[in-house]
A protein has these predicted regions:
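N-terminal secretory signal peptides
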Residues: 1-22, 46
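N-terminal export signals
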Residues: 22-46
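Beta-strand-rich N-terminal accessory domains
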Residues: 48-135, 143-156, 161, 168, ...
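Active-site-proximal substrate-binding groove within the catalytic cores of carbohydrate-active enzymes
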Residues: 76-77, 95, 256, 455-668, ...
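Conserved structural scaffold segments of CAZyme catalytic domains across common CAZy folds
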Residues: 132-386, 569-612, 621-627, 636-641, ...
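Active-site-adjacent "subsite" loops/lids of carbohydrate-active enzymes
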Residues: 303, 372-426
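Active-site groove signature of glycoside hydrolases
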Residues: 329-340, 416-445
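Acidic, His- and aromatic-enriched active-site or binding-groove loops in soluble protein domains
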Residues: 353-360, 393-405, 491-505
Length: 699
């Protein structure tokens, strides 16, 4: 369950707010039957789909750090930075792009702090309290974050302002094999409250910079390099030739408390921006990409109504039997959406669950899965929302105009404790957090700057408890890739489901879903990975408006289109009794295909046109093992799309030049393969509403 998302404030600059279409004008072109759409293309920086760092690659690009005289250097063959510490004053000196044999722009300051009275404190005006330190970072094979599974180097400098109000610990971090360098700062108030209002981590002048998106938390791109404050609420902006990456703050910094922020600078091979940036995202996100197939109760047993333990068990057993036992499908979770709680309490089970999720957990384990649960930080929707708010106000839980205030200390504790109890008592492996609340306003007495800030801290606490937890952060998010430092997926925007274009209700639903993705994500956040969206799944359920039947036999098209997106959050909003054996077979075939091709589908990116305009479109992904192309025609007339696999797959220079394409689906087994040659256009005819899936192997 989700709702229309809140609009994100764009970065504050004339050249901020570049749409993906504008951004991709600098890339290569794919011709389609209705015109041409620009695609930003590139070759992998590390020789496979994402340049995933294995032992050999990390060994080829080891991080090194040195401290000599008044210089501190951190780097590898891809990127190197040097800072000076002359007379105890810390300043950036130079940065080198080893991939492109060029220099990178250097800020005058490592950071700048701005206070409520508009005064500023530069890093160079602070005084080092100890000599620079360098240390090795050990690889932790059990870490959730992939970068932490790789060794590296870290340099650290501690400093204080001359008034003795603030201590800052600055660190430069580089992991082996990385083509990016991260800057981390920890700020601590020493005596009295410090009215800190803004932290700037990147500020310099450079021509031809751009922000490839219209939402906050979008990286700045300059040629083959990128710069960003690593936070979804940050303002990464371009104003003329001035580049700034900064983060506002509302609350004063209390004595003894600390806050942490970070930034990144990365380099890419020419034409490689999307894929090489995706490499960075995959390494630094909370958890790497993974397929996560699960049932969701919304539209089935719950739709603004309460359901029971018996209802949940029936759904678990139906899906477990049909998919896991009969068809050998791996199921990851069974998520119970709105309706499990008594909305006249606050996140307590309704009377239909006398033992909580105890029976649910046992049932999911029979099929190799675990329970998941929906919770809404702001309290949900409709009458259940009104009931929760009314009860919450009586009990003293904090509220704001959106509903509950997660930044309120009392409510935060109840919400956090409920989440931790779900993990500890019932083995919950997934949270769907639906509706986060205020992005900027602070609740009086809160330790958090906003409800979103509270949500980020909450997720951190939950991941400490369960590192492989799946977190789906829905309403209120937008396509900043830095949400993925905390959550596994975010909402595509728009309605849960609606209809667009022409054809049957199911075809119009597919068009609506994909058009929303194109408009809200592909165009608004060029560097956000499509693989990490909540798309609102496959829908065939008894309480889903106009999607409780399939008179046009379009369900197979919906399922193949859905898995072709490469999304890792694979949701089934399905009533088991409505499906035929053939429907179950389709889901099973596609789910197995997706899981076995995750190493390729992680690279999924958009190709073609605008579904809303009934233009043919789809998704392409490539790895050294194969290429995958999924295409759809949203029109009731046949249309052509012209594909050059070199451009569609962003082939590296050493990749094969010829491919044989065939469908992976059993119904097309025996169909002769079709040859594609890199650098040559090939016209593909798509019949009305056709969904075509092609796997391409090198000749």
């Amino acid at each position: 369950m989700a709702d229309n998302r809140d609009p994100a404030t764009p970065a504050d600059s004339p050249r901020s707010g570049v749409t993906r279409r504008d951004f991709l004008d600098r890339g290569s072109r794919i011709a389609i039957g209705l015109g041409a759409l620009q695609l930003g293309l590139g070759r992998s920086a590390f020789g496979d789909v994402l340049g995933m760092v294995g032992k050999s690659r990390a060994g080829e690009l080891p991080a090194e750090s040195t401290i000599a005289a008044d210089e501190v250097t951190l780097g590898n063959a891809s990127i190197t930075a040097t800072w000076t510490t002359t007379s105890g004053s810390f300043r950036p000196a130079k940065m080198t792009d080893g991939l492109n044999k060029s220099s990178l722009p250097v800020p005058a300051q490592a950071f700048v702090l701005t206070f409520a009275d508009k005064t500023t404190l530069n890093a160079s005006d602070m005084r080092m309290t100890s000599p620079p330190q360098t240390e090795s970072l050990a690889a932790d094979p059990t870490a959730s974050r992939k970068s932490e599974r790789v060794a590296g180097r870290k340099v650290t400098i501690s400093m204080r302002d001359t008034a003795g109000r603030i201590e800052v610990v600055w660190s430069g971090v580089l992991r082996d094999g990385s083509a990016y360098l991260r800057q981390e700062i920890t700020i601590r108030a020493l005596e009295g409250e410090v009215p800190l209002r803004e932290i700037s981590l990147v500020d310099f002048n450079a021509p031809n910079a751009m922000v490839p998106g219209t939402v906050r938390g979008t990286p700045i791109v300059i040629g083959t390099s990128y710069f960003a404050f690593e936070h979804p609420l940050a303002n990464n902006g371009v104003d003329g030739d001035r580049i700034r990456c900064r983060m506002g703050r509302t609350l004063p910094l209390r004595p003894g408390t600390t806050i942490e922020f970070s930034s990144v600078v990365g380099v890419t091979h020419p034409g490689q921006l999307r894929r090489d940036f995706l490499t960075y995202v995959e390494r630094e996100r909370a958890h790497p990409y993974r397929t996560f197939l699960h049932y969701n109760s919304w539209y089935d047993i719950g739709y603004f109504n309460k359901y029971s333990d018996a209802d949940a068990l029936a759904a678990i057993n139906a899906f477990g039997t049909e998919l896991h036992q009969k068809r050998g499908v791996t199921l990851d979770s069974f998520l119970f959406d709105d309706g499990w709680d008594d909305s006249k309490t606050l996140w307590r089970f309704n009377s239909g669950f006398p033992n909580g999720f105890t029976n649910v957990e046992a049932a999911t384990h029979k099929y190799g899965a675990a329970p998941g649960v929906w919770m809404s930080p702001w309290g949900g929707y409709g009458q259940p929302h009104a009931d929760r708010i009314a009860y919450g106000k009586e009990q003293g839980f904090e509220t704001n105009k959106e509903g509950f205030a997660l930044s309120g200390p009392i409510y935060y504790k109840r919400f956090r404790d409920t989440c931790l109890d779900m993990i500890r008592r019932y083995g919950v492996n997934q949270f769907k957090f639906d509706g986060t609340g205020e992005t900027t306003n602070t609740f009086p007495g809160s330790p958090f700057d906003s409800d979103f800030d509270a949500a980020i801290h909450l997720i951190g606490e939950l991941r400490t408890e369960k590192p492989d937890l799946y977190v789906n952060l829905t309403t209120g998010t937008y396509p900043s890739p830095f949400w993925l430092r905390y959550a596994d997926s975010i909402w595509r925007g728009g309605e849960d489901h609606s209809f667009a274009g022409i054809g049957t209700s199911r075809q119009r639903w597919i068009t609506y879903r994909d058009a929303d993705t194109y408009e809200n994500v592909v165009r608004a956040g060029a560097l956000f990975p499509i693989n990490s969206l909540m798309l609102h799944g496959m829908i065939y359920a008894k309480q889903a408006h106009n999607l409780m039947t399939d008179p046009g036999n379009d369900f197979t098209s919906e399922v193949r289109d859905y898995f072709g997106t490469g999304t890792q959050l694979q949701e089934m909003y399905i009533t088991a009794s409505l499906l035929t054996p053939a429907n179950w077979d389709t889901i099973a075939e596609c789910a197995k295909w997706s899981r076995s091709n995750a190493d390729t589908l992680v690279d999924t990116h958009w190709v073609g046109g605008d579904p809303q305009r009934l233009q043919p479109y789809g998704w392409a992904s490539w790895s050294s093992r194969k290429g995958i192309l999924t295409l759809r025609n949203p029109s009731n007339v046949a249309q052509d799309i012209t594909i050059d696999v070199e451009r569609a797959f962003e082939l590296p220079p050493n990749a094969p030049r010829q491919f044989l394409a065939k469908s992976p689906w059993a119904q097309y087994r025996g169909t002769p393969p079709v040859r594609f040659r890199a650098g040559q256009d090939r016209k593909i005819r798509l019949e009305p509403f056709e969904v075509l899936t092609l796997e391409m192997s090198a000749v």
